[in-house]
Amino acid sequence: INPICAVERKMDLDELARCFAQGRQRFQREFERATDQGCRIYLLCENASWENLINGKYRSKVNANAFTASAMAWMVRYNMNVVFCKEETSGRLIREILYRDLKERLENGEYG
């Protein structure tokens, strides 16, 4: 069974920075597989914001400009939706994303 929707959750910008730096090849393969299967991808990052990413307000040594460029490039390359939130709301958001994605596909007749 191919996934139709995936939510990639990261606990903060430092974890996401590690994916773009040390684990980039593995992270890239995951996104390429999902994209090849027509999967919609949502990247949910807790305890973060675009402002924190752009301004380098995280512990990682990854350059803020490079980090921002990678995030933007992946949004375009993999048609990825980025969601920033507090950790208290991540469970609810994941549920809503999965529910709304499936509901939209059903209403559009993607399943019979």
Question: What would you call each of these model-derived segments?
Answer:
Residues 1-3, 14-112:
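Non-catalytic C-terminal interaction segments of nucleic acid-processing enzymes
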Residues 5-11:
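Conserved catalytic cores of phosphodiester-cleaving nucleases, focusing on short active-site segments
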